[in-house]
UniProtKB/Swiss-Prot annotation:
GO terms for molecular function: dITP diphosphatase activity; ITP diphosphatase activity; metal ion binding; nucleotide binding; ribonucleoside triphosphate phosphatase activity; XTP diphosphatase activity. Substrate binds at S22, H23, N24, Q25, G26, K27, S84, F167, G168, Y169, D170, K190, H195, R196. This is dITP/XTP pyrophosphatase. It catalyses: XTP + H2O = XMP + diphosphate + H(+); dITP + H2O = dIMP + diphosphate + H(+); ITP + H2O = IMP + diphosphate + H(+). GO terms for cellular component: cytosol. One of its GO terms (biological process) is purine nucleoside triphosphate catabolic process. The active site is at D83. Belongs to the HAM1 NTPase family. Its EC number is 3.6.1.66. It is an enzyme of class 3 (hydrolase). Keywords: Hydrolase, Magnesium, Metal-binding, Nucleotide metabolism, Nucleotide-binding.
Length: 209
């Protein structure tokens, strides 16, 4: 897969249609909010009726690139993919790239959070509750050029989960320096500190500003 290194000149994203390579409504909402100041015309892979490709990469970046390449090839437009997940220190960084799969089909993140809690409980009371979210972004052009970015946010897991303003594992994650979970702090506060926001800051600085 093509990797873009910091020493190479970044390709700018020109005005026009940008296809968001996602079927996850929570992600789509956050991505559109982050892109809203730039006047891009966005449409999702779900809205275009595109299937989801098999994500068989061994990293967040690899899976984001698989999705972005698939959509760029199918649509002939620039595509942006997000692959993200929760990495728990005491679980050897699981669920990691399998974060969505832990939620099963159809996606049930209450079940996924319960599984994380059960796995940690099995480790014993001394198990670390440290965890971090990762967000990998892959921006792919129809000619195959790719720009990749990755953001992180560190914190601790809580149980029981709290809040109903997020999605995924948000209700069980409290970022360092905060007392509320990602599902309690609200969209604007989350946007200021999240892994997705960090990855987007890199993308915007490199390809849009």
């Amino acid at each position: 897969m093509t990797q873009t290194h910091s020493s190479e000149k970044r390709r700018r994203l020109e005005p026009g249609r940008l296809v968001l390579a996602s079927h996850n409504q929570g992600k789509l909402r956050e991505i559109r909010e982050l892109l809203s100041p730039f006047g891009l015309e966005t449409v999702s892979a779900a809205e275009l009726g595109l299937p989801e490709p098999v994500e068989d990469g061994n990293s967040f970046i690899a899976n984001a690139e698989i999705k972005a390449r698939f959509v760029a090839e199918k649509t002939g437009s620039v595509a942006l993919a997000d692959d993200s997940g929760l990495c728990v220190e005491a679980l050897d960084e699981a669920p990691g790239i399998y974060s969505a799969r832990w939620a099963g089909e159809p996606r049930d993140f209450d079940k996924a959070m319960e599984k994380v809690h059960q796995e940690l409980t099995a480790k014993g009371a001394e198990a670390s509750k440290r965890a971090h979210f990762v967000c990998a972004l892959s921006l792919c052009w129809p000619d195959g050029h790719v720009e990749n970015f990755e953001g992180h946010v560190w914190g601790n897991l809580i149980w029981p989960p709290r809040g109903d303003r997020g999605f995924g594992y948000d209700p069980m994650f409290v970022a360092d320096g905060h007392q509320q979970s990602f599902a309690e702090i609200g969209a604007e506060a989350k946007k200021a500190i999240s892994h997705r926001s960090e990855a987007f800051k890199q993308l915007l600085a490199a390809c849009l500003r």
